[in-house]
């Protein structure tokens, strides 16, 4: 088994997926790092959501086994939580596809990389509409519960990832469906967070009334 470290990046250069070599402070790696960070935060959201809703206490190994079998559906969870976890896992897979597209600059190699489609964007819009059911009348402050708070971290990280991606468009062409998907993600996490908070929200006016 090869070692995890290669020492090839000790002088500030590293490889993209297509084999091209660039400086580590390249905008490419800002985008890839933001996507990676976002996926990690989504993973934490999945773990919190699972821990908050699991009905039967199992060993950690059994929990992991149950979580990944049957299309990520677990017999320990209610249908609503299973649905939410499945949505989040789908988004993580799409982020991997997006990262692969960004990391392949060579046009001759892009055909082998999974593409995001217009249907992927529409599916994300359907999920936004699914959870955006209570009209919003004023600005909100995060922190109703753990899942809500973690979801807002996902929201703010997705916005940063989108900003980085638009900076990348100054150097290379980025697929329009990827840009649309990244734009929708922050909206999804906002509507999703409101559902996770059971629409019990901390409004700015509530804080002002206290002070």
Describe each model-derived feature in a short phrase:
Residues 1-211:
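Phosphate/pyrophosphate-binding loop motifs in nucleotide- or prenyl diphosphate-using proteins
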């Amino acid at each position: 088994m090869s070692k995890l470290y290669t020492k090839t990046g000790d002088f500030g250069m590293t490889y993209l997926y297509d084999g091209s070599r660039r400086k580590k402070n390249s905008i490419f790696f800002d985008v890839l790092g933001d996507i990676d960070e976002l996926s990690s935060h989504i993973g934490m959201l999945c773990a919190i959501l699972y821990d908050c809703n699991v009905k039967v206490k199992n060993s950690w190994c059994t929990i992991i086994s149950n979580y990944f079998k049957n299309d990520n559906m677990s017999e320990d969870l209610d249908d609503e939580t299973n649905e939410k976890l499945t949505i989040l896992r789908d988004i993580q897979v799409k982020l991997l596809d997006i990262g692969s597209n960004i990391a392949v600059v060579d046009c001759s190699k892009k055909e082998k990389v999974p593409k995001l489609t217009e249907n992927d964007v529409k599916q994300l819009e359907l999920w936004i509409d699914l959870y955006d059911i209570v009209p919003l009348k004023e600005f909100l402050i995060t922190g109703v519960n753990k899942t809500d708070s973690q979801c807002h971290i996902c929201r703010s990280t997705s916005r940063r990832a989108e900003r980085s991606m638009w900076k990348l468009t100054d150097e290379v062409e980025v697929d329009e469906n990827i840009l649309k998907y990244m734009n929708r993600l922050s909206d999804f996490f906002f509507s999703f967070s409101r559902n996770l908070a059971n629409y019990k929200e901390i409004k700015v006016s509530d804080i002002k009334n206290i002070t």
